[in-house]
């Protein structure tokens, strides 16, 4: 074993959930409902699961396309062939957010059909694109799609309600397997709750299999994030109490991120802490700071000390 640090099994089960192993195979093209066709982006991997899901929505010749994958030749070949074979034209191309695995296919799509240049929609549009606003409606035969602003995973993230199916295109906010990541955890939690309030039964995620029980999946996501907050706040509160016992009342104490990780997960390789855990745990700490439940001492984010401002039961 040498000087190697032991791996924490519970951490790896969480971190690798839905990543590369034991994922169900998804067809390259599939009719997932009578009005929704899923076309995979051809970009499978640890961050993209089976690849980016792009969706053709509608029942007539005119359809809505949601997302354009990463820009790999496999995707433009699949979708262009499908459009030609089924005599379909695109009325709207809706982008859930700016990340490259969702917008990368736009140039290929326009190169294939220059008439689509003015049919690209995004919340924070690039030059020549159209904006998407909260509540905006996009309609074609057989499909009414309503945009819902859901920031957090990214600043411009949109979900889309398919009214005819009471279904939600969840983008990257909720995945078919495992958990997503957030740029702004506070906004992300608000968006998850707003998505839950829509009461859609079915989820069409941007990565992974269809979510048959979307309310249950949203509850799982919310509880997972809230559980992490409670766990970290409890760890810091315990340190606060023990620090006051050791050094007297009024002592803030505090733990570095490494010390928090060791307390919660046990000892892990430093590379794992910095590359896998630190980004998400720092987001939790920042949210707790914004909620005025945690404070910190100035310094490097990985080395500064964090301390509880209030106690928990």
UniProtKB/Swiss-Prot annotation:
Protein name as annotated: Lactamase-like protein nscB
GO biological process, one term: secondary metabolite biosynthetic process
Cofactor remark: Binds 2 Zn(2+) ions per subunit.
EC number from the UniProt entry: 3.1.-.-
Entry keyword annotation includes Zinc: yes
Ligand binding (Zn(2+) 2): 101-102
Family: Belongs to the metallo-beta-lactamase superfamily.
Family annotation (Pfam families): Lactamase_B
One function term, GO molecular function aspect: hydrolase activity
Coiled coil: none
Role of this protein: Lactamase-like protein; part of the gene cluster that mediates the biosynthesis of neosartoricin B, a prenylated anthracenone that probably exhibits T-cell antiproliferative activity, suggestive of a physiological role as an immunosuppressive agent. The non-reducing polyketide synthase nscA probably synthesizes and cyclizes the decaketide backbone. The hydrolase nscB then mediates the product release through hydrolysis followed by spontaneous decarboxylation. The prenyltransferase nscD catalyzes the addition of the dimethylallyl group to the aromatic C5.
Co-factor requirement: Zn(2+)
Residues forming the catalytic site: 101
Key words of the record: Hydrolase, Metal-binding, Zinc
CDD domains the UniProt entry points to: LACTB2-like_MBL-fold (cd07722)
Residues annotated to bind Zn(2+) 1: 97, 99
Annotated pathway: Secondary metabolite biosynthesis
Species per Swiss-Prot/TrEMBL record: Arthroderma gypseum (strain ATCC MYA-4604 / CBS 118893)
InterPro entries recorded: LACTB2-like_MBL-fold, Metallo-B-lactamas, RibonucZ/Hydroxyglut_hydro, Sec-metab_biosynth-thioest, WH-like_DNA-bd_sf
